[in-house]
């Protein structure tokens, strides 16, 4: 059976981090969209994700940038997308 892929916007927030952890426990390949500034200082902006960070695929982007979103969706091709 093919591993499902999920893409989460808002993955750095409380709900996004809980959802990511839950989906990982179900065997999903989890991808998240984060703003570039979060990747520049991960211990400050990504602290909720630190326990699971090694199992996540994070992509730099913003919902205001159609080209960035298009590239992420094209590259990831998620089975499910969660906008939080």
Predicted regions and their residues:
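N-terminal Rossmann-like NAD(P)+-binding domain of SDR-like oxidoreductases, especially those catalyzing
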Residues: 1-84
């Amino acid at each position: 059976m093919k591993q499902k892929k999920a893409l989460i916007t808002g993955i750095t927030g409380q709900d996004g981090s809980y959802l990511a952890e839950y989906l990982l426990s179900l065997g999903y390949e989890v991808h998240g969209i984060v703003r570039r500034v979060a990747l520049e200082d991960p211990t400050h902006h990504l602290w909720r994700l630190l326990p699971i960070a090694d199992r996540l695929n994070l992509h730099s982007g913003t919902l205001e940038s159609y080209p960035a979103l298009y590239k992420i969706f094209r590259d990831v091709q998620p089975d499910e997308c969660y906008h939080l």
